[in-house]
Amino acid sequence: LVAVLDVTIVTIALPSVRRELGFSGGEVQWVLTGYALSFGGLLLLMGRAGDLYGRRRMFVAGLAVFAAASLWGGLAWAPWVLVAARLLQGVGGAALVPASLALLTATFAGGEERNRAMGVYGAMAGVGFALGMVLGGVITEFLGWRWVLFVNVPVALAVLSLAPVVIRESKDDRAPCTLDLAGAATATLGLAAMIYAVSEAPYNGWVSPTTICTAASGTVLLGVFVTVERRAAEPLAPLPILGRRGVAVTNSAVVLKSMVGAAQLFVLTLYFQDALGYTPLQAGLLFVPMTAASVVASPLAGQLTSRLGERRTAARGFAITAAGLVMVASCLSSEGGLVAVLFGMVVAEAGFMIANVPLTIAATGEVGDDERGLASGVLSTSTEFGNALGWAAVAAVIAAVAESGPGGEDALLSGLRWGLWSAATIAALALVLLILFMRSGIAGKKRGLHAP
């Protein structure tokens, strides 16, 4: 919850961060994207390290790094310092999350008991994603944006003091003795280059040499990643598993879901504070209905999954999310319509949670016990890469519309609307993906994926 919460608790503080540290243009989104990139890029590597060296050990080490990076980020005096601290935070989170998830799956037996535990895990992730906006607003208003990072330190210290007592060590004696560092490096750097190309294209030009060369470099690095994984004795991400239809489609849906959630929160933060002029506290409180929708929808999603199956439940969630985002985009205005915007937010968030819980269950539901750690790592990696892509893409859309428009308030509102239209389109694509390709994949009523 702490690692997921930190993704969004910083989002509400972005306008304050931008003003105080002097971020220019679309650079401020790297405060979010940098965290997600290092987090997502190292998840599988850290998961493998946990199997090899001990999950409790990785959990403790990751939490310690996370706390130290939070302290450093809170003391940041320049944009690059904050981005660097967020990158380091992502490293800590990458060690923390797969270790906690592996400890969870090792604790609970298979079947319904494990499904319930995974459902709670998915629900906590979704609730943390929304709750961070509220807490971020309160903290930024009364204590300043630096405290959205400082607050992690006492929480981490408390958990670190209890971990040796309440958490039993767990590791896989069959885990490989080598770590695929080349795979982790090429995947992370490749995606970083692609995201940089997209995020900076509105300023450099979509066909500028910088954009083209950066995108080409990212493509080459991702191609090298595939080659490395095919030849590695102990690959970071075994391609035969990722090539299974069920695993591939589910994680593709997770990426799209995360893009939608990240884009929505980014746009609404700018709308409330930059377009409407609300304070961080007021903006944070406007996310309370959305958070309430998460809390209510989480158990409902579990019930629907038991009744309808994962695919049908997730598909309904994406349909509801798309409808809610269309509602919000249609009502954005600097002169009113706030109630309609809030209602659309509630609808979109309810749909998000209804999609999130079954996808979390499905992502680890059809692999063997010896593959659950990998499947959990792939799920978390897909989530973080989706977040990074969502922030970069929506920032690029907003910037492109603003650059092509007359400027001022109308250009900002137009960019925000297009950002939400883009998020709604991504949700619709996820819906189509599930309908067309999952077939019996995650449609099993009380089971996970069945890859043809």
Q: What are the residue ranges of the model-derived segments?
A:
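Transmembrane-helix bundle of Major Facilitator Superfamily
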Residues: L1-V165, L300, L308, A319, ...
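Short helix-kink/termination motifs in transmembrane helices of multi-pass secondary transporters
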Residues: V2-A13, S38-G41, R55, V148, ...
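Cytoplasmic-side transmembrane-helix entry/capping segments in multi-pass membrane proteins
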Residues: A61, E113-A125, P176-T186, T211, ...
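Interfacial helix-cap and linker-helix signal at transmembrane-aqueous boundaries
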Residues: V17-R18, A49-G50, L135-L143, V198, ...
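Hydrophobic transmembrane-helix bundles of small-molecule transporters
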Residues: G119, E141-V254, V260, Y278, ...
